[in-house]
């Protein structure tokens, strides 16, 4: 007769199972395990007296005959596709199986073979997510990359050359020479990286040479002049070479209004940065474009979520980031035109209903590179407290809301930028860029970050201690952050045209160069998983009130947030 144990005892030994609920950090978000792919009584667990031992849960199968390189045991997987429990098998830096691990000679239903050559990562009671993607990076300081990695990001896309004033304001790596230097620099960092060229030009020649030099995308920024002519030219080049276009529109409405920008886009796919407008864009109604079926709208994290401090901090940020002077009245007026509490409040709600598709950082240029996940979950928590359960929820949990919000910094930016065949979800065949979390620290401080199946970062105690846990415990680079393991564990994304033109041989870089694919007509707002709503947006030009399909979008600023000072005492 089978042995029975209580749910609490089972969760303590093997982690939660079907029907169990888990609180995410100190939020009001609760997930429920939808399905458990492990087998009761046949679970694999590593340790003294446990299951993964020779002749028990560990088989005699060689790597060549199918044993995996690494098994992650009893993980709660939180993904856009669902919330479930399973073992995860990794091989050659990719996810090769999700399901039941063990020894097929002794155990039934095994699809992940554990052999003598298999390493074990114990995920009992832990959450596993796909590594995050931050799609709005100003490459101002290389130290951003370590900060992002330690927060659970494994891919960064953007532009820049360092603390040049063009980079301080705009996410562009301008020209083939600068792109070459940045792609060369990418070899030094444990992070998947992708670079955007400058998209502001009225003739295609200079844009084409940037795509051929490795740009994965082109960025239109108002500080370089986002005119209708530049928009049309940039999108035409992008359509020819299959790269994405990101746009920061004309705050001052000098070369046209939001309707003129929509007209210049001509129904072509485009990623609209900080679509609410505090980060820049047609004042006061750039937010209207989130209702366009060809526009993929995103937020940057300083306005996530709307709090009592949001408005006050933005003016100074704007003055610094956009090279403005407090002694010039026009510069002050420019800055003030972008900060509107009504549109920021509406942004919260538009995220919650799935009309805004992506959250990113805007690193060091009105954005905090280490807080993409934190700000995403703070927004989700604020919306649950203020708006209650989503109508799509089934059962007494927040599973759908959690799936909607995690998609905003994993699968959706990957789809938008042509990377989703490689990254963005916990899925067989994709890169094993994975993050382990203690549920109490979910979204705030990872337990472990894997790049290409190797451990790149983790909190670690005193290296001279007799065990790994004594203080001081802080985040440290792990072995995938060093030597050839670094360049073999992460990649640099480039355009297909640049690969065809011999970019890798020309630069002699060590990292694999991987082409982006399907960034143009094959995707649209409808491709944004759980975040594809296209409401008709109206903005009152006098009061700045925002309506979606006639409904006023208004909410109060938060006075207290989860995932904040409780986690950062020092």
Swiss-Prot record:
Modification(s) after translation: Carboxylation allows a single lysine to coordinate two nickel ions.
UniProt cofactor(s): Ni cation
Positions with a binding annotation for substrate: 221
Pathway(s) where this gene product acts: Nitrogen metabolism; urea degradation; CO(2) and NH(3) from urea (urease route): step 1/1
Keyword Metal-binding assigned: yes
Domain Urease: 131-570
Recorded superkingdom: Bacteria
Localization of this protein: Cytoplasm
GO biological process, any: urea catabolic process
Assembly mode: Heterotrimer of UreA (gamma), UreB (beta) and UreC (alpha) subunits. Three heterotrimers associate to form the active enzyme.
The protein, known as: Urease subunit alpha
Species, as recorded: Rhizobium johnstonii (strain DSM 114642 / LMG 32736 / 3841) (Rhizobium leguminosarum bv. viciae)
Taxonomic lineage from the root: Bacteria, Pseudomonadati, Pseudomonadota, Alphaproteobacteria, Hyphomicrobiales
């Amino acid at each position: 007769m089978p042995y029975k144990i209580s749910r609490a005892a089972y969760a303590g030994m093997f982690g939660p199972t079907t029907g169990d609920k888990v609180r995410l950090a100190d939020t009001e978000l609760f997930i429920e395990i939808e399905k458990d792919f492990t087998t009761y009584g046949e679970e694999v667990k590593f340790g003294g007296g446990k299951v993964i031992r020779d002749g028990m849960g560990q088989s005699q199968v060689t790597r060549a005959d199918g044993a995996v390189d690494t098994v992650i045991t009893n993980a709660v997987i939180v993904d856009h596709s669902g919330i479930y429990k399973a073992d995860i098998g990794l091989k050659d830096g990719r996810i090769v199986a999700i399901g039941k691990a063990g020894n097929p000679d002794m155990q039934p239903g095994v699809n992940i073979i554990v052999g003598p050559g298999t390493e074990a990562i114990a995920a009992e009671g832990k959450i596993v997510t796909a590594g995050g993607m931050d799609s709005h990076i100003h490459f101002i300081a290389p130290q951003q990359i370590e900060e992002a990695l330690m927060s659970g990001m494994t891919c960064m896309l953007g532009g820049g050359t360092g603390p040049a004033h063009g980079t301080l304001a705009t996410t562009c790596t301008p020209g083939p020479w600068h792109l070459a230097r940045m792609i060369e620099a990418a070899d030094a960092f444990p992070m998947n990286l992708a670079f955007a060229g400058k998209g502001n030009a009225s003739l295609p020649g200079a844009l084409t040479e940037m795509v051929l030099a490795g740009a994965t995308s082109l960025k239109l920024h108002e500080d370089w002049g986002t005119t209708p002519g530049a928009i049309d030219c940039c999108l035409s080049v992008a359509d020819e070479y299959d790269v994405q276009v990101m746009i920061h529109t004309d705050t001052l409405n000098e070369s046209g209004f939001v309707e003129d920008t929509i007209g210049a886009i001509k129904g072509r796919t485009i990623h609209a940065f900080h679509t609410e407008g505090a980060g820049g864009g047609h004042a006061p109604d750039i937010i209207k474009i989130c209702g366009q079926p060809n526009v993929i709208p995103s937020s940057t994290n300083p306005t996530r979520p709307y709090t009592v401090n949001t408005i006050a901090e933005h003016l100074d940020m704007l003055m610094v980031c956009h090279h403005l002077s407090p002694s010039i009245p026009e510069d002050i007026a420019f800055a003030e035109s972008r900060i509107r509490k009504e549109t920021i409040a509406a942004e919260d709600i538009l995220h919650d209903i799935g009309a805004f598709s992506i959250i990113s950082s805007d690193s060091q240029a009105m954005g905090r590179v280490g807080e993409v996940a934190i700000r995403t979950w703070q927004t989700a928590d604020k919306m649950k407290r203020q708006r209650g359960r989503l109508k799509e929820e089934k059962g007494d949990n927040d599973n759908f809301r959690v799936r909607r919000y995690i998609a905003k910094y994993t699968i959706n930016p990957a789809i938008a930028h042509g990377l989703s065949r490689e990254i963005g979800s916990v899925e067989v065949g994709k890169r094993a860029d994975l993050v382990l979390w203690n549920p109490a620290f979910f979204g705030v401080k990872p337990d472990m970050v894997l790049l290409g199946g190797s451990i790149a970062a983790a909190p670690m105690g005193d290296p001279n201690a007799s065990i790994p846990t004594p203080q001081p415990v802080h985040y440290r680079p792990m072995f995938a952050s060093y030597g050839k393991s670094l360049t073999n564990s992460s990649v640099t994304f480039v355009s297909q045209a640049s690969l065809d033109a011999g970019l890798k041989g020309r630069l002699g870089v060590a990292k694999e160069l991987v082409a982006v694919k399907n960034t143009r007509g094959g995707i649209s707002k409808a491709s944004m998983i759980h975040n594809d709503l296209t409401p008709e947006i109206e903005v009152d030009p006098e009061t700045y009130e925002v309506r979606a399909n006639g409904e006023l979008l208004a909410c109060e600023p938060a006075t207290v947030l989860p995932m904040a000072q409780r986690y950062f005492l020092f």
